[in-house]
Amino acid sequence: MREEELIQEEKAANRLDTADPGHRHLFHVPPADGGRYQQAAYLAGNSLGLQPRATRDELFADLEAWRRLGVEGHLAADRPWLPYHELLTAPTARLVGARPAEVVVMNSLTVNLHLLMVSFYRPTGVRTRIVIEDSAFPSDSYAVRSQARFHGLDPDSTVVRLAPRPGEDTLRTADVRDLLAAEGDTIALVLLGGVNYLTGELMEIPEITAAGRAAGAVVGWDLAHAAGNVPLALHDWDVDFAAWCSYKYLNSGPGGLSGVFVHERHLADPTLPRFEGWWSTEAATRFEMSPVARPPATAEAWQVSNPPILAMGPVRTSLEVFDSVGMTALRERSVRLTGYLEWLLDQVTPGRPLAVVTPRDPDRRGAQLSVRIGTGSAAELAKRLRLEHGVVADAREPDVVRFAPVPLYSTYHDCWRVADALAATVEVH
């Protein structure tokens, strides 16, 4: 696309924003660090989501309850702290396609993965191995390797890393199925990312879950890049367990709380091991101070400590946005927005050392396009995009820059600015 054509395309992007406006008005958008626009073109919501405008007032309301009531706020606050986490249960269940008893919001993501693996990674005999993606987020890799060591196993031989075929960037579901069919009797746990953090590939969760369970393995999912990004139906897909964070697409703020899903078939299993604490016991008898926990037959049994109220408020505020907009509408806009960014990138990447590595099929990706650069540093390119053009993206060294057109608040003009910035920053070779 020539420069004059790119200029004309800006008008088309503005028309698309008029016809398909999204919900940007509900969020605070940071100012641009450079370029000719006042606001940043923020395409880093897959790293940290923007702050909903309602969050500040709601957080201050919880702070005011603490100031005004002290300890009495546990029962007397407008939103009493003792059952506060229950306010998140129904909207969380709707978000991930679960029954309310199957979900709870608590802790952070990797902590929850460890707590879940206490229950669901139970190596016995030859069935000891854990399957993850070769490009899994490092924290997941560290977690499963440490779980192997905890059980006295060699992590190098216990952890199976699924890699794409030579010359390809993403996994094929058929290859995952083939591995599970051929070696399933040695696999105790399959733990994959629902959307791969690096490539943006949306895994075929129902198919892989069915294949893993048919092989006799437990199947869990890290949904950090899937929750709030793509529609989920965890109960119907028969997923054993899942966990996700809330600070990316769910916009709960840096380090925001994690969500947990445990399928209802496991909830009343008395043989399932689990770490317990004060909040593991049923609420009705919690303050009887019994020395023996009486866990409820819900995902709340995986709780250990009382929840941080000031961290739960932003999650609640964000979930209200998702309830009001709906995942179906968000997904439809996401497909349109990401498709437009893909088309724009196709206009500016020819002749430049840039290649989109995210699947081209909209059904195999969420709100992310990852671009591999052929020369230079990904971090340096992301820095130039931000400082010279006000485009905020996320670099993953050594050579990937990730762009996330989040359907809640990203615009078609944001996507145009990405293409314009890349055309101005990356030279044609």
Curated annotation (Swiss-Prot):
GO MF, one annotated term: pyridoxal phosphate binding
Claim: Hydrolase is one of the keywords in the record: yes
Binding annotation for pyridoxal 5'-phosphate: 109-110, 137-140, 222, 225, 247, 278, 306
Gene Ontology cellular-component annotations: cytoplasm
Catalytic reaction list: L-kynurenine + H2O = anthranilate + L-alanine + H(+); 3-hydroxy-L-kynurenine + H2O = 3-hydroxyanthranilate + L-alanine + H(+)
Cofactor: pyridoxal 5'-phosphate
Family the UniProt entry places it in: Belongs to the kynureninase family.
Subunit structure: Homodimer.
Protein name per the record: Kynureninase
Organism name: Salinispora tropica (strain ATCC BAA-916 / DSM 44818 / JCM 13857 / NBRC 105044 / CNB-440)
Lineage, opening ranks: Bacteria, Bacillati, Actinomycetota, Actinomycetes, Micromonosporales
